[in-house]
Amino acid sequence: MGLNHTLSLLKFLENPHKNLKIIHIAGTNGKGSTAATIYNILISSGYKVGLYTSPHLINFNERIRVNGVTITDEEIISFMKHVEPAVNEIKSTFFEVTTAMAFYHFKDHDVDIAIIETGLGGRLDSTNIVNPSLTVMTPISLDHMDILGDTIEKIAKEKAGIIKERVPLITAKQVNEVLKILEKRTKKKSSVMYICPNPESIQLNVDGTSFEVFGKIYTTSLIGCYQAQNAALAIAATKIINPKISSKSIDKGLRNVHWPGRLQLVSDNIYYDVAHNESGIKSVLKNLKIMFPNSNLYGLLCLKGDKEIDCIAECIKSQFEMLFVSTSKDGLLLSSKKL
């Protein structure tokens, strides 16, 4: 992590990020879903929108897209050939190169607005060289404690590092310790903080989630109570960007959003989720029990070796009728025996 390498690489590329209108998103859980929802609402409103997220689920190209079209292999190869001398000289990391690629791609495609998700933390994240029009903060909880800090306050300070001078912040509801840190940072930066209200009247089914917020009832194609919260935050963000965005555009964007790996129905009564920290897994289990209150749950679990295993084990204990564990041959995942 750090900013100097990214700045040097972007300078070589003639600073493609500087004239982009940007929404910058940080937080612990829900960043991708919130970013994808903002993206779809803005597209439905007639904007040409770039989206940069990480990590990818299936292939690298997913990280960078414009109006539903991912960056092509040819565009990736062309960019890498162009930037290779600078990368070798600067000794750029994978994420620094990927971030520069996103900005270059968005400038090349002349987007109206780019939605940029932080990779890890905020303060020293490679994306934190932008001067956005809006900062968005999803719920902050414990994750990546070996890098960001071992308390919620330390992690919140890292995330709050993306709040810029006089740039408004819209945040999801946060625990008091986090809220105090965000308030302090926005005050220091002469900014203003808006707190998104929690959605009400949430209803889940296999087709999505309906909820009420800002006096209207909406439905997102994503499943989960937390997806109602993510959608509410996305609606609030788009209304700050453009107060004239219509309810029709919001409705269309919410129904069109597709973000695989988030309580995704892959087959009859089989759901897949990429939750990888305690708060995320608790949310998944809570929503499954809401959807299937009288059913036994059977699970398949695999985790990378850098996760807080003890906390995760405690929160899934006794939640399943039967739990299977799996690993991978590449050594990235914990062994089945340890799990």
Residue positions per predicted region:
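A conserved segment at the C-terminal end of the G1
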Residues: 24-25, 33-50
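ATP-dependent carboxylate-amine ligase catalytic core
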Residues: 8-11, 15-18, 44-130, 146-148, ...
